[in-house]
């Protein structure tokens, strides 16, 4: 039978309309929710019982069927199935949409998946979906051709008509001109006639006048004229002159002249008339020509216009392609041009139709592949993006048209509840409002379509439906968010998943749990390390069901109901039952914030009075708890397995070492330290000083008789040896009779008392014990008792009896933990006792102000006055003055601290507290007794006005005001830092949550070099760094060459000492950075588990441990640098938390250092403006030599330039020598030497405030730092490769933590850095089927390449990518983990399109779906073993068992193999089983054609 919850992968994909309908139990057609009078769900509404199931268990809507006996009956009256009401949490409905709508995730995401698939820009796609533009969905090709021909015919006819009209007009113009010219001829002749007649009349007039005058003159001839006689105004005879023959001649002359003038005028008039006629004729002819030309132009214009119009229309027809987007105007035009040729539409329906008709994924993939191969730059980038989407659809089996919804699922009503409030009003989930909007608009649209409403109204309603569905899926993604009453934004389905309040983070990754409580904590000084005090009232509530059961079992109550009553009334028997119950249970205590795994530990509960939880003082450090009002939560692990896990793994006494650095975390502190310090102090001159005793017992007797002071130095003879150095004299004595060493030592009673409390192997410690000393005792104790060599068989059997038959290493760990816990408890009791008896307390008298202080202050004031004087005189700048003043006061503060130190009474309580490490440090004492010194202002700049007073003297108002600045900044910084550190931890956990120890050995030959030369004041010593690592190569003695240790040996304390003693200064070790495990890490690359001091176990969640170890001390790091004012030098730009974030996010650092891009020689150049440039010049010279054989002669001259492939010498028979280089040729005797210089230059401009690290002429390597600051890790990766950047990131992170005194093992940082470098970017896909630019896991990449190479194909090439932790988290293989981290909608969109499968390998994804995490005890089921590994291992085991049988009886050791049912089989059966299984596996070799599906189901038992 298949277990429904037992699956090992989960897949997400797009839902088809058929899927949505198959999930549904009915269609929701009404927007109603519940009836306001009956308060029952409306039929066919959003809460309909017929669709979603009954609201009451086993009862139908109308009440016809009630009770469980009708289970499964569907009521014939109301249609409701009689079943449990909880089906309303799982039954879905659906809405049939009247018009398809797009799913906003696939439209508005970046990049728009729908847009990429259709090759439409997101803006255009949006215009189509929201009814602003049309998209062509169909073009009828045959009709298109007909339309083209019709247009061509129409325009041909129009051209013909225009040409015909133009011809007619031309003929008309020509005729008109001929007529006009003829008329002009006639008019000209008529004018000539008129002129002739006129002149004839004038001639006649002159002749007639002349005749009359002649007659008169003839009459008067011979007489004198009595007046002037005139002819036409000209005097012929003046008055008094005689009239004679001459007078007549004169008259004739005048007549002749007159006639000549007249004739001249006649000729002129005739000529003028002719000229006028000619001009008119020419004008007419010209006008006619112009008109003809105009006509011709107009004709041409009209023809051109027609041609253009025709061309445009034909072009528009040509652009009628399916998928083209057109505006409303263009649509109308095209519809007029080519009616019936095409169909265009708007909205999601059009897009869906387009996808169904045009998208052929296989063909599209081929086209895009070809384009990627042939194109460059932006086009290639776009094609790759498109291909990624196309391939996702192809491989996943999703259909692209499913991105457009035709059916909308309605989620179960109990997931969008509606509840009645006190006042009778209802509170409802926002989803109901959003669904109502969809249903209302959908119903309205259906009605409009039925009524055949105008297109514009239907279109508007479709757009509104699209917007309603958008708001339901992801409100606010497009346009204004839909808001409900009170203007609050309605929470859509996407909002239900996103963010801290979303489904993933609020309900799946963290839940509120039952059987828990919380209370204030108080100290429990009398508890043992594995105990806590639980208030009785609280315990009774937590264990109520168990107590009730126990009461029934004991017969105190007859049934559960009575038992419950007894518990509620708190009868005396209840406490006895509670005592019994609580014996078997451990409880978990948790203090928020849970920054690391030690924030939750298991304890045995001791019932106490009162209401506060009592906590053991030594576990406070792990919880980071104090007793100033802290609260803690209690949880009860319920199941047997949970209890067992709590007991074996979480009990506080088994969590003594910090997983971050492997040192004890239960170190005594405060009072305990003070008590032990007081106890081990030596006070010369105290009562009984210098006395001698023959034994410890004798000395103790003297002390008890009050003859000795507890701190008096006394001499004692004792047997045994000293543990560590002694701070008092020691004299060795002759050995005792049994050979034990003896000595005479100076010590004190206090030290004897302390040593009496130590385990025997840890004695005798004859020195002042401070906090560090106590830490050493705990560490030594754990180390001694967990080392198998120090344990006897009896001790191991003792553990076996109580903890079962476990592995000896595990038994040693348990024994060591228990012994250390006992030791810690004894020290605790001793410390508390003597802190009390010592009576050390601080009074105001203990704080003495040193007399020197006032001199120091006066001196400093004088120096400051001198500096001010120099500044006023202009000898120094304002900045220099400030720096000098700050320096003077810092020096004065330093001197004051020294003075306070010297002035302290070493036996005074203040000094004891400080020097023992119990509380406080010299700086704080100095603020009380010396001077407070300089303060920082809110920006972090130091205020140059110091506080010269101390708290003993009291601060003035100004002092107090100045000090508030720094204090306030400190508080604000702490608050900010906490949030930042929390977020950093979250990102680290996310990036490393799937790093689990999955296999024994990945078999890699790679590793990490640890160099002793790297030891500096910040880095740990080599001895510490190599502890717990596994050797990656054999290590030999430097001088003798003998093998010290082989590969894959764990370096423990002894081996580390031996390696250093052999003179080796560097060690090649395995590291998580180089682990080749396909999933998680292997045991050997990780090495020692720091929390146990033993090799890490399979199933350990080392990724999370690493993240917690780095994140937990994050709050201790400073937030920003305190600048000492002025320009910060580049090396102090970022420190503390921001620097850690910078490192793990792989950002370009602030104050970035310049790196050398090539190997070469440095030249530092400064231009006129003072800008510095570093030039790196690299000159490589290559030479090639060509010997000249017999008969060969050069064809070039000495020192001539030659190029590659040039003939440089010829020999007999046309033989030639050709050069392989381009450069200069030198002829030297019988050979030619060609020399080529490869010259490279790089110039880098140095920022004005950067300090240059290199000298002029210095040789540098690529990737070397040229200026101060932090290197950009991306550049480092490019220039020096993966190993350099790994080393850099680990060292940089360590520098930040170590500078703050935080100790973290390198291993943890390496785990994170490995995750940052896990991806590679494909450059050339080869035959792998990957896409260029795709990010892929490096293990997956190696596997694909190996498969391809084994099949004879071309492998892919790729570049290592360095991703920041946020990006790396989002790029994880698990979509559940990525979606629950950040950018939920984007992750789910991508995953759905790709049909991603989550194999549930990490922790988060298993927590999300509610399965046990594949770590710790949850991994046994999960260990994946490849087929070949299994066969190999079985073969090896078979061989071993055979060897064992052949071996002599005394050397034979039984190593029975667990059979599948967990029992141990007898040896012979075991062999038979192995052999049979092995043969079965090997026989399957020849017949290896099982389908993949069969192979997956054929799970092998995990042997």
UniProtKB/Swiss-Prot annotation:
<dbReference type="Pfam" id="PF04983">
    <property type="entry name" value="RNA_pol_Rpb1_3"/>
</dbReference>
<feature type="compositionally biased region" description="Acidic residues">
    <location>
        <begin position="1486"/>
        <end position="1503"/>
    </location>
</feature>
<dbReference type="Pfam" id="PF05000">
    <property type="entry name" value="RNA_pol_Rpb1_4"/>
</dbReference>
<dbReference type="InterPro" id="IPR007066">
    <property type="entry name" value="RNA_pol_Rpb1_3"/>
</dbReference>
<dbReference type="InterPro" id="IPR045867">
    <property type="entry name" value="DNA-dir_RpoC_beta_prime"/>
</dbReference>
<feature type="binding site">
    <location>
        <position position="75"/>
    </location>
    <ligand>
        <name>Zn(2+) 1</name>
    </ligand>
</feature>
<feature type="binding site">
    <location>
        <position position="1075"/>
    </location>
    <ligand>
        <name>Zn(2+) 2</name>
    </ligand>
</feature>
<feature type="binding site">
    <location>
        <position position="62"/>
    </location>
    <ligand>
        <name>Zn(2+) 1</name>
    </ligand>
</feature>
<dbReference type="GO" id="GO:0003899">
    <property type="term" value="F:DNA-directed RNA polymerase activity"/>
</dbReference>
<keyword id="KW-0808">Transferase</keyword>
<feature type="binding site">
    <location>
        <position position="628"/>
    </location>
    <ligand>
        <name>Mg(2+)</name>
    </ligand>
</feature>
<dbReference type="GO" id="GO:0008270">
    <property type="term" value="F:zinc ion binding"/>
</dbReference>
<dbReference type="GO" id="GO:0000287">
    <property type="term" value="F:magnesium ion binding"/>
</dbReference>
<dbReference type="GO" id="GO:0006351">
    <property type="term" value="P:DNA-templated transcription"/>
</dbReference>
<dbReference type="Pfam" id="PF00623">
    <property type="entry name" value="RNA_pol_Rpb1_2"/>
</dbReference>
<feature type="binding site">
    <location>
        <position position="1002"/>
    </location>
    <ligand>
        <name>Zn(2+) 2</name>
    </ligand>
</feature>
<dbReference type="InterPro" id="IPR007083">
    <property type="entry name" value="RNA_pol_Rpb1_4"/>
</dbReference>
<comment type="similarity">
    <text>Belongs to the RNA polymerase beta' chain family.</text>
</comment>
<dbReference type="Pfam" id="PF04997">
    <property type="entry name" value="RNA_pol_Rpb1_1"/>
</dbReference>
<dbReference type="InterPro" id="IPR038120">
    <property type="entry name" value="Rpb1_funnel_sf"/>
</dbReference>
<dbReference type="GO" id="GO:0000428">
    <property type="term" value="C:DNA-directed RNA polymerase complex"/>
</dbReference>
<dbReference type="InterPro" id="IPR007080">
    <property type="entry name" value="RNA_pol_Rpb1_1"/>
</dbReference>
<feature type="binding site">
    <location>
        <position position="1082"/>
    </location>
    <ligand>
        <name>Zn(2+) 2</name>
    </ligand>
</feature>
<feature type="region of interest" description="Disordered">
    <location>
        <begin position="1439"/>
        <end position="1503"/>
    </location>
</feature>
<feature type="binding site">
    <location>
        <position position="60"/>
    </location>
    <ligand>
        <name>Zn(2+) 1</name>
    </ligand>
</feature>
<keyword id="KW-0548">Nucleotidyltransferase</keyword>
<dbReference type="InterPro" id="IPR044893">
    <property type="entry name" value="RNA_pol_Rpb1_clamp_domain"/>
</dbReference>
<feature type="binding site">
    <location>
        <position position="1085"/>
    </location>
    <ligand>
        <name>Zn(2+) 2</name>
    </ligand>
</feature>
<dbReference type="InterPro" id="IPR007081">
    <property type="entry name" value="RNA_pol_Rpb1_5"/>
</dbReference>
<comment type="function">
    <text>DNA-dependent RNA polymerase catalyzes the transcription of DNA into RNA using the four ribonucleoside triphosphates as substrates.</text>
</comment>
<dbReference type="InterPro" id="IPR012754">
    <property type="entry name" value="DNA-dir_RpoC_beta_prime_bact"/>
</dbReference>
<keyword id="KW-0460">Magnesium</keyword>
<keyword id="KW-0804">Transcription</keyword>
<dbReference type="InterPro" id="IPR006592">
    <property type="entry name" value="RNA_pol_N"/>
</dbReference>
<feature type="binding site">
    <location>
        <position position="630"/>
    </location>
    <ligand>
        <name>Mg(2+)</name>
    </ligand>
</feature>
<feature type="binding site">
    <location>
        <position position="78"/>
    </location>
    <ligand>
        <name>Zn(2+) 1</name>
    </ligand>
</feature>
<keyword id="KW-0479">Metal-binding</keyword>
<keyword id="KW-0240">DNA-directed RNA polymerase</keyword>
<protein>
    <recommendedName>
        <fullName>DNA-directed RNA polymerase subunit beta'</fullName>
        <ecNumber>2.7.7.6</ecNumber>
    </recommendedName>
</protein>
<dbReference type="InterPro" id="IPR042102">
    <property type="entry name" value="RNA_pol_Rpb1_3_sf"/>
</dbReference>
<dbReference type="Pfam" id="PF04998">
    <property type="entry name" value="RNA_pol_Rpb1_5"/>
</dbReference>
<keyword id="KW-0862">Zinc</keyword>
């Amino acid at each position: 039978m298949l277990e429904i919850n037992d699956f090992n992968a989960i897949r997400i994909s797009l839902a088809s309309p058929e899927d949505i309908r198959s999930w549904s139990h009915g269609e929701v057609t009404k927007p109603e929710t519940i009836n306001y009078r009956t308060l029952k769900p409306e039929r066919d509404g959003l809460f309909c019982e017929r669709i979603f199931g009954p609201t009451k268990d086993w009862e139908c809507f109308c009440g016809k069927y009630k009770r469980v006996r009708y289970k499964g009956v569907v009521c014939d009256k109301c249609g409701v199935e009689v079943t449990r009401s909880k089906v309303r949490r799982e039954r879905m409905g659906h809405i049939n949409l009247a018009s398809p709508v797009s799913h906003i995730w696939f439209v508005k995401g970046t990049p728009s998946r729908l847009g990429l698939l259709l090759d439409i820009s997101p803006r255009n796609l949006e215009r189509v979906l929201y009814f602003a533009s049309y998209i062509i969905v169909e073009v009828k090709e045959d009709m298109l051709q007909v339309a083209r021909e019709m247009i061509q015919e129409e325009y041909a006819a129009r051209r013909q008509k225009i040409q015909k009209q133009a011809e007619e007009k031309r003929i008309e113009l020509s005729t008109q001109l001929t007529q006009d010219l003829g008329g002009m001829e006639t008019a000209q002749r008529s004018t000539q006639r008129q002129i002739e007649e006129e002149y004839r009349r004038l001639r006649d007039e002159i002749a007639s006048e002349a005749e009359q005058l002649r007659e008169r003159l003839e009459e008067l001839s011979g007489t004198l004229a009595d007046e002037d006689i005139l002819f036409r105004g000209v005097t012929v005879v003046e008055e008094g002159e005689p009239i004679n023959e001459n007078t007549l001649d004169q008259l004739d002359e005048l007549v002749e002249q007159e006639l000549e003038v007249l004739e001249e005028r006649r000729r002129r008039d005739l000529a003028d008339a002719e000229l006028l006629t000619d001009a008119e004729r020419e004008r007419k002819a010209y006008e006619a020509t112009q008109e003809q030309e105009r006509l011709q132009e107009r004709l041409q214009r009209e023809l051109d216009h027609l041609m253009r119009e025709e061309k445009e229309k034909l072009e528009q027809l040509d652009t009628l392609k399916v998928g083209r987007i057109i505006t409303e105007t263009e649509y109308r035009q095209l519809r007029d041009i080519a009616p019936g040729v095409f169909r265009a539409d708007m909205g999601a329906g059009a897009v869906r139709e387009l996808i169904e008709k045009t998208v052929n994924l296989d063909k599209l993939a081929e086209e895009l592949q070809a384009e990627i191969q042939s194109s460059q730059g932006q086009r290639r980038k776009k094609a790759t993006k498109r291909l990624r989407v196309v391939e996702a659809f192809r491989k996943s089996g999703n259909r692209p048209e499913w991105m457009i919804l035709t059916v909308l699922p309605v989620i179960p009503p109990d997931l969008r509840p509606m509840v009645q409030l006190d006042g009778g009003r209802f509170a409802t989930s926002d989803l109901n409002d959003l669904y109502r909007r969809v249903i209302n608009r959908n119903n309205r649209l259906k009605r409009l379509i039925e009524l055949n409403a105008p297109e514009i109204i239907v279109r508007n309603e479709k757009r509104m439906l699209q917007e309603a569905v958008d708001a339901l899926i992801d409100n606010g993604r497009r346009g204004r968010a839909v808001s409900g009453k009170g203007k609050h934004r309605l929470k859509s389905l996407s909002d239900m998943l996103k963010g801290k309040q979303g489904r993933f983070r609020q309900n799946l990754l963290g839940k509120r749990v039952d059987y828990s409580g919380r209370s204030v904590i108080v100290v429990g000084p009398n508890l043992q390390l594995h105990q806590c005090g639980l208030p009785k009232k609280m315990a009774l509530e937590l264990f109520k069901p168990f107590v009730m059961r126990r009461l029934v079992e004991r017969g105190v109550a007859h049934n559960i109901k009575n038992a419950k009553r007894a518990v509620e009334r708190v009868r005396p028997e209840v406490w006895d039952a509670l005592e019994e119950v609580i014996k078997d249970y451990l409880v978990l205590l948790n203090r928020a914030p849970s920054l690391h795994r030690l924030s939750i530990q298991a304890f045995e509960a001791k019932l106490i009075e009162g209401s506060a939880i009592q906590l053991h003082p030594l576990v406070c450090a792990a919880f980071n708890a104090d007793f100033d009002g802290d609260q803690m939560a209690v949880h009860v692990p319920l199941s047997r397995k949970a209890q067992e896990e709590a007991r074996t793994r979480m009990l506080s006494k088994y969590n003594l070492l910090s997983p971050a650095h492997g040192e004890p975390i239960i170190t005594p502190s405060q009072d305990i330290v003070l008590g032990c310090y007081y106890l081990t102090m030596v006070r010369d001159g105290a009562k009984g000083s210098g006395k001698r005793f023959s034994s410890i017992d004798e000395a103790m007797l003297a002390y008890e008789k009050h003859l000795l002071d507890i701190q008096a130095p006394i001499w004692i003879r004792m047997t045994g040896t000293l543990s560590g150095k002694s701070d008092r004299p020691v004299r060795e004595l002759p050995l005792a009779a049994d050979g034990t060493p003896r000595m005479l030592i100076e010590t004190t009673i206090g030290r004897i008392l302390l040593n009496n409390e130590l385990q025997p192997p840890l004695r005798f410690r004859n020195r002042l014990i401070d906090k560090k000393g106590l830490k050493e005792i705990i560490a030594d104790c754990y180390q001694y008792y967990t080392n198998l060599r120090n344990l006897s068989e009896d001790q191991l059997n003792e553990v076996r009896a109580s903890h079962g038959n476990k592995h000896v290493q595990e038994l040693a760990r348990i024994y060591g933990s228990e012994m250390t816990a006992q030791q810690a408890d004894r020290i605790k009791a001793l410390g508390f006792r003597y802190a009390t008896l010592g009576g050390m307390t601080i009074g105001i008298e203990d704080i003495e102000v040193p007399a020197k202080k006032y001199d120091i202050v006066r001196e400093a004031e004088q120096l400051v006055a001198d500096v001010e004087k120099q500044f006023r005189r202009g000898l120094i700048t304002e900045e220099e003055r400030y720096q000098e003043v700050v320096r003077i006061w810092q020096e004065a503060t330093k001197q004051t601290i020294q003075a306070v130190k010297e002035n302290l009474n070493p036996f005074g309580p203040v000094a004891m507290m400080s020097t023992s490490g119990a509380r406080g440090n010299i700086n704080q004492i100095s603020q009380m007794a010396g001077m407070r010194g300089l303060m920082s202002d809110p920006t972090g700049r130091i205020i140059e006005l110091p506080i010269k007073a101390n708290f003993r003297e009291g601060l003035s108002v100004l002092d107090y005001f100045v000090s508030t600045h720094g204090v306030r900044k400190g508080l604000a910084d702490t608050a900010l830092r906490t949030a930042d550190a929390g977020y950093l931890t979250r990102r680290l956990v996310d990036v490393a949550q799937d790093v689990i120890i999955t296999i024994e050995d990945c078999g890699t030959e790679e590793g990490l070099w640890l160099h002793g030369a790297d030891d500096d004041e910040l880095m740990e010593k080599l001895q510490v760094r190599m502890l717990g690592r596994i050797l990656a190569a054999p290590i030999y003695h430097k001088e003798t060459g003998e093998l010290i240790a082989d590969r894959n040996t764990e370096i423990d304390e002894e081996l580390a000492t031996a390696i250093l003693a052999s003179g080796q200064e560097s060690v090649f070790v395995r590291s998580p950075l180089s682990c080749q495990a396909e999933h998680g890490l292997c045991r050997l690359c990780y090495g020692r588990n720091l929390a146990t001091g033993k090799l890490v176990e399979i199933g350990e969640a080392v990724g999370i441990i690493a993240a917690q170890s780095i994140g937990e001390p994050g709050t201790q790091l400073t937030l920003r640098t305190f600048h000492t004012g002025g320009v910060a030098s580049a090396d102090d730009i970022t420190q503390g938390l921001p620097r850690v974030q910078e490192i793990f996010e792989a950002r370009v650092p602030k104050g970035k250092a310049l790196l050398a891009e090539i190997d070469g020689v440095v030249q530092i150049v400064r231009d006129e403006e003072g800008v510095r440039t570093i030039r790196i010049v690299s000159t490589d010279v290559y030479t090639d030599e060509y010997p000249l054989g017999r008969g060969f002669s050069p064809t070039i001259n000495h020192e001539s330039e030659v190029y590659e492939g040039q003939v440089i010498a010829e020999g007999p028979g046309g033989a030639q020598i050709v050069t392989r280089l381009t450069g200069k040729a030198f002829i030297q005797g019988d050979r030619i030497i060609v020399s080529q210089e490869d010259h490279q230059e790089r110039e880098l401009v140095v920022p004005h405030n950067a300090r240059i690290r290199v000298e002029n002429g210095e040789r540098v390597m690529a990737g070397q730092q040229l200026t101060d600051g932090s290197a950009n890790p991306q550049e480092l990766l490019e220039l020096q490769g993966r190993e350099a950047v790994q080393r850099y990131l680990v060292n940089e992170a360590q520098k930040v933590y170590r500078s703050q005194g935080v100790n973290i093992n390198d291993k943890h940082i390496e785990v994170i850095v490995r995750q940052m470098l896990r991806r590679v970017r494909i450059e050339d896909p080869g035959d792998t089927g990957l896409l260029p630019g795709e990010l892929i896991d490096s293990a997956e990449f190696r596997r694909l390449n190996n498969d391809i190479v084994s099949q004879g194909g071309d492998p892919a090439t790729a570049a290592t990518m360095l991703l920041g932790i946020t990006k790396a988290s989002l790029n994880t293989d698990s979509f559940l983990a990525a979606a629950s981290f950040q950018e939920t909608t984007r992750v789910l969109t991508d995953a759905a399109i790709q049909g991603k499968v989550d194999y549930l390998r990490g922790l988060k994804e298993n927590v999300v779906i509610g399965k046990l995490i594949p770590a710790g005890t949850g991994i046994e089921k999960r260990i994946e073993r490849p087929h070949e590994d299994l066969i190999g291992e079985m073969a090896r085991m078979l061989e071993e068992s055979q060897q064992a049988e052949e071996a002599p009886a005394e050397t034979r050791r039984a190593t029975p193999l667990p059979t599948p049912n967990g029992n141990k089989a007898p040896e012979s059966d075991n062999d038979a089983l192995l052999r049979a299984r092995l043969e079965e596996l090997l026989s399957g070799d020849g017949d290896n054609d099982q389908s993949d599906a069969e192979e997956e189901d054929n799970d092998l038992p995990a042997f």
